[in-house]
């Protein structure tokens, strides 16, 4: 080793500091927004960030936030009446506002002796006066009806009963009930069909194929203003009915000879093969059906004759050869329909149309749910004239 070229380096000698070309990074402590993965929300953390990151956060805060679409409500919103003891609910605020009037002060009082009823407004008081005066100036112009009403609204509702397309027919088989208003049909189904577990109520159903004929009644028994157009044609019998099939039941029970005379014009002849004789056997529909079921030609004639059921009382059987029984003993007494009286009583209760009111229908359409208020039972009619 060449000792002359060797240079001694002192380890404690201070070395010169070399300056870096890159500028120093500036750190700032700031609240930084962070996303929460678990819940999907957001939070802010107080931590150190560089100056560049801090400037980007400031620019992002200046951008407007895009509003997120709100989810559609899955629950039904109801408006509850806050009056103490009421508790009725409504679908919209307008129905609640209309209902709230019934809880106001009733300052219009009827001055008739012994009445003293109070009302919320003068129009309802004027309508109430019609009960005391008995005025019924709105008369039905339909031929054969002549019903009178105190309010034009009740007359318009009644006129719908004379139009067939406005009827709501009961969907249950065997039930012939029909109503001019849908809510009446719902009440009928709930009372007679759903209450009995969906069973059919015993009813007399007239055949659909038969064309009903209008019975011409004397003017002295049933005038043009009567609501029972089907009257008994027999002199001295003042029975009148709203439906034609009820008149037929009455004639069948009280005047059996009338139906026998009516059916005598169109007798049914049963032709048999290989025989020159024609026999009339009206003992029962089942016997006639059995006879023609075994005969080829008579089967087609039976199908045509059974298209229109015969409602007359069966006369005595024609005596056959070798029979010693008299025609009087051979007469068959047809048993009366057991459920007829019950059906007539139910029909009589529902056949009279009560005067309906505008507020009754509004309550059904508005759909108040819970609670009952009997204070406004007297105010269930609406008039179109207001103060």
UniProtKB/Swiss-Prot annotation:
Stimuli inducing this protein: Induced by abscisic acid (ABA) in an ABI1- and ABI4-dependent manner. Stimulated by stress conditions including high salt, osmotic stress (e.g. mannitol) and dehydration. May be induced by ABI4 but repressed by ABR1. Repressed by darkness but induced by light.
Pfam families assigned to the protein according to its UniProt record, in alphabetical order: zf-C2H2
Top-level lineage group: Eukaryota
Zinc finger residue extent: C2H2-type: 79-103, 108-132, 138-162, 168-193, 230-255
Span of the signal peptide: none
Disruption of the gene: reported phenotype: Deregulated expression of glutaredoxins GRX480, GRXS13 and thioredoxin TRX-h5 leading to enhanced susceptibility to fungal infection (e.g. B.cinerea). Increased sensitivity to abscisic acid (ABA), drought, and salt (NaCl) stress. Reduced induction of ABR1, but reduced repression of RD29A, RD29B, and COR15A in response to abiotic stresses.
Region of interest: MED18-binding: 201-290
Modified residues (Phosphoserine): 284
Keyword field contains Cytoplasm: no
Motif Nuclear localization signal location, chain numbering: 319-326
Tissue: Mostly expressed in flowers, to a lower extent in seedlings, stems and leaves, and, at low levels, in roots and senescent leaves.
Transmembrane segments: none
Localization in the cell: Nucleus
PROSITE patterns attached to this UniProt entry: ZINC_FINGER_C2H2_1, ZINC_FINGER_C2H2_2
Positions with biased composition (Acidic residues): 344-363, 373-387
Sequence ranges of Basic residues compositional bias: 291-305
InterPro entries attached to this UniProt entry: Znf_C2H2_sf (IPR036236), Znf_C2H2_type (IPR013087)
Region ranges (Disordered): 258-387
Cysteines engaged in disulfide bonds, as pairs: none
Coiled-coil parts of chain: 339-367
One Gene Ontology cellular component annotation held by this UniProt entry: nucleus
GO BP: abscisic acid-activated signaling pathway; defense response; negative regulation of abscisic acid-activated signaling pathway; negative regulation of DNA-templated transcription; positive regulation of DNA-templated transcription; regulation of defense response to fungus; regulation of DNA-templated transcription; regulation of response to salt stress
UniProt keyword annotations, A-Z: Abscisic acid signaling pathway, Activator, Coiled coil, DNA-binding, Metal-binding, Nucleus, Phosphoprotein, Plant defense, Repeat, Repressor, Stress response, Transcription, Transcription regulation, Zinc, Zinc-finger
Main function: Dual-function transcription factor with both repression and activation activities. Binds to 5'-CCATATT-3' motif in target gene promoters (e.g. ABR1). Also binds to G-rich DNA motif 5'-GGGGGCAGTGG-3'. Regulates the expression of genes involved in diverse cellular pathways, including glucose metabolism, photosynthesis, phototropism and stress response (e.g. salt, drought and osmotic stress). Regulates plant immunity, especially during necrotrophic fungal infection (e.g. B.cinerea).
Assembly notes: Interacts with MED18 to suppress disease susceptibility via the repression of genes glutaredoxins GRX480, GRXS13 and thioredoxin TRX-h5.
Name listed for the protein in its UniProt record: Zinc finger transcription factor YY1
Source organism: Arabidopsis thaliana
Gene expressing this chain: YY1
């Amino acid at each position: 080793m060449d000792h002359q070229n060797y240079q001694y380096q002192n380890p404690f000698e201070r070395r010169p500091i070399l300056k870096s070309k890159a500028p120093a990074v500036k750190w700032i402590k700031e609240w930084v927004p962070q996303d929460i993965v678990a819940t999907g929300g957001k939070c802010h953390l107080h931590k150190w960030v560089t100056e560049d990151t801090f400037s980007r956060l400031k620019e992002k805060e200046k951008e407007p936030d895009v509003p997120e679409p709100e989810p559609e409500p899955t629950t039904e919103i109801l408006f509850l009446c806050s009056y103490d003891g009421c508790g009725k609910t409504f679908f919209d605020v307008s129905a609640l506002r209309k209902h709230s009037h019934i809880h106001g002060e009733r300052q219009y009082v009827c001055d008739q002796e012994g009445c003293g009823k109070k009302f919320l407004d003068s129009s309802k008081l004027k309508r109430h006066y019609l009960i005391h005066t008995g005025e019924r100036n709105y008369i039905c112009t339909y031929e054969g009806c002549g019903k009178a009403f105190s309010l034009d609204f009740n007359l318009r509702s009644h006129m719908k009963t004379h139009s067939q397309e406005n009827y709501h027919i009961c969907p249950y088989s065997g039930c012939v009930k029909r109503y001019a208003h849908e809510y009446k049909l719902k009440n009928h189904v709930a009372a007679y069909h759903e209450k009995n577990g969906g069973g059919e109520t015993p009813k007399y159903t007239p055949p659909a194929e038969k064309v009903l004929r209008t019975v011409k009644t004397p003017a002295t028994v049933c005038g043009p203003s009567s609501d029972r157009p089907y009257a008994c044609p027999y002199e001295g019998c003042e029975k009148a009915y709203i439906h034609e099939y009820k008149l037929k039941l009455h004639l069948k029970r009280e005047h059996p000879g009338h139906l026998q005379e009516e059916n005598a014009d169109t007798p049914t002849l049963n032709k048999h093969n290989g025989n020159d004789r024609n026999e009339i056997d009206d003992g029962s529909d089942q016997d006639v059906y059995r006879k023609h079921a075994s005969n080829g030609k008579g089967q087609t004639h039976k199908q045509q004759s059974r298209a229109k059921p015969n409602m007359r009382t069966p006369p005595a059987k024609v005596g056959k050869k070798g029979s010693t029984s008299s025609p009087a003993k051979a007469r068959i007494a047809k048993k009366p329909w057991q459920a007829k009286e019950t059906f007539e009583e139910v029909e009589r209760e529902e056949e009279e149309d009560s005067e309906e009111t505008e507020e009754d229908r509004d309550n059904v359409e508005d759909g108040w749910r819970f609670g009952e208020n009997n204070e406004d039972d007297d105010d269930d009619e609406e008039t179109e004239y207001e103060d």
